[in-house]
Amino acid sequence: MSGFDDLGIYYSDSFGGEQPVGDDGQAKKSQLKKRFREFLRQYRVGTDRTGFTFKYRDELKRHYNLGEYWIEVEMEDLASFDEDLADYLYKQPTEHLQLLEEAAQEVADEVTRPRPAGEETIQEIQVMLRSDANPANIRSLKSEQMSHLVKIPGIIIAATAVRAKATKISIQCRSCRNTIGNIAVRPGLEGYAMPRKCNTEQAGRPKCPLDPYFIIPDKCKCVDFQTLKLQESPDAVPHGELPRHMQLYCDRYLCDKVVPGNRVTIMGIYSIRKSGKTSTKGRDRVGVGIRSSYIRVVGIQVDTEGTGRSAAGAITPQEEEEFRRLSAKPDIYETVAKSIAPSIYGSSDIKKAIACLLFGGSRKRLPDGLTRRGDVNLLMLGDPGTAKSQLLKFVERCSPIGVYTSGKGSSAAGLTASVMRDPVSRNFIMEGGAMVLADGGVVCIDEFDKMREDDRVAIHEAMEQQTISIAKAGITTTLNSRCSVLAAANSVYGRWDDTKGEENIDFMPTILSRFDMIFIVKDEHNEQRDMTLAKHVMNVHLSARTQSSSVEGEIDLNTLKKYIAYCRAKCGPRLSAESAEKLKNRYILMRSGARDHERETEKRSSIPITVRQLEAIVRISESLGKMKLQPFATETDVEEALRLFQVSTLDAAMSGSLSGVEGFTTQEDQEMLSRIEKQLKRRFAIGSQVSEHSIIQDFLKQKYPEHAIHKVLHLMMRRGEIQHRLQRKVLYRIK
């Protein structure tokens, strides 16, 4: 309790010229309290046919009997009962909320009589407010809104521990022991200014010294309070600017309502407090009237629901009807896939996989309390210039909750969570990173291969268990990170080298098995495809400024975003019995196929086929069912999920040594290529040159296939060991 004696924490609440309340003011307050009491007692819902129910009276009684001394009042109900009352509460919430709480206490006293023995004294009631008005933005808060009710959306990124704050204090003079009791302390982060002088005058006693008063902790009345840090939503931040923050003050039953990572909408009073200690030097006197702002919270709505999904915002019945029509289309899967990044040509399978990732499977809670993730993770590996980053950028815009980050610019703490010291209390607090903020959405990680190995290991738990466990600086806790991961990476050699096989992939099997689908994207040379691609790119550049009509069958971005949010909120399909049986048989075949391949090549694949991959196919099937708003994933969905898995992960696993258009390279072919290379290096020394035609003829005489000779020459040129000279007729060895 020694903290109460520290005089430095009490701030003056005398900012602004408040007038003393006279008889008129007291009469007006009594009148307003009476009207608030009538509202709580008489407001009713229902019609003549169905019968009326007294909404707030019944709610007060129910809450009070359960030992929950709070009630939530809707501003729209208050406005329909008495518009002036609602206006007073909007314009001057600090004093009128106090009157509303006193009125609620009086009504609770009436409706809960007779109370059991020992509970005769009525408890104080906390009134929370909620409103359906359009929310403002942290950036739009100006001095005009000071001391008004505001509604702000955002993400909670930090929360302090719950502490006690005095609401009524008793002070005593050190010298003459004069006690002043029951002094009300203003709510919020403002404190109380202790009197400088003791006014007690006793004959024959010296005057009391300056600052004689101290607080008697035992006679103080305290409530719980907690401060939160709110960051504005990523979609509200203008491009190129940092997200802004706002400090929140919660008390009583509003404490411990939210955790870092929750998306919330706050109803609160925009308030000010003294901004730290200012130095007495001349240059700082200009800051005397400057106050820092915070919001005193009077209501919290958590927008991320229990399953970690973004609640489908305000969807109108017309939109719902449109979504139902859309889901009933037989080609909805193709339509959604075409609507993903329409400016990027081709990559149809990758777009279909991204569609599955956006909709996601169903999260399951098992009877023993464990959970199975429903989110799909996707990795794109391959050549530069294959529109990987463009797809990631589109997904960030298209997902209801999307966070984009680049591998090199992301640390383990930035992706998961960091522990830092609170500048006010000097205690350690925790701030959530990208994967916590994207709870219920998608994290896009570009340049995944450029990340440090230590940072990549940090997201192992987040990808499979969908939690982030922290044990730092005395804080041991677990945060939710129920999000999909879409990652893009390049090959070790920059471009994909077909002869190197698995050496192209520089990832551990532990991280690869956490991805449901792994696509190897190659920039293949094909004249017809190159021509079509060039035409498409030219059209995109030429019609960039013109507002062209959407391609046939496409859904516009806003509709797609709302449709994804709607499907994720409303639908959680499961596998049907027939599709489960089919999937079981196919999985056994896949395992045996991968095992045979490993036996043939005498080396283990770095992309394993495990039970995780079986669960991956289940998730992909469920996401296809969710796209159509179906309760069960059918056999057709399982077929498509298996096909997607086949063209992505299975092909990548089997391509231990793919040799382009020639198909699989066996161990013998690999040995033959290495024999040709050794002979070639023996043929001519470093710094010498030989005719290319004569070398090819010599090897052909030794019965080596021509394509193998050309492949070895091509590889040695890419590695910079030989180069062409004299109009590409002569080969010159550099190293």
Swiss-Prot record:
Its main location: nucleus. This is DNA replication licensing factor mcm5. Component of the mcm2-7 complex (RLF-M). The complex forms a toroidal hexameric ring with the proposed subunit order mcm2-mcm6-mcm4-mcm7-mcm3-mcm5. The heterodimer of mmcm3/mcm5 interacts with mcm4, mmcm6, mcm7 and weakly with mcm2. Component of the CMG helicase complex, composed of the mcm2-7 complex, the GINS complex and cdc45. PANTHER family: DNA REPLICATION LICENSING FACTOR MCM FAMILY MEMBER (PTHR11630), DNA REPLICATION LICENSING FACTOR MCM5 (PTHR11630:SF42). A motif (Arginine finger) lies at residues 513-516. It is found in: Nucleus; Chromosome. Belongs to the MCM family. The lineage of its organism: Eukaryota, Metazoa, Chordata, Craniata, Vertebrata. Keywords: ATP-binding, Cell cycle, Chromosome, DNA replication, DNA-binding, Helicase, Hydrolase, Nucleotide-binding, Nucleus. GO terms for biological process: cell cycle DNA replication; DNA replication initiation; regulation of DNA-templated DNA replication initiation. It comes from the Eukaryota. One of its GO terms (molecular function) is DNA replication origin binding. GO terms for cellular component: chromatin; CMG complex; MCM complex. Residues 332-538 form the MCM domain.
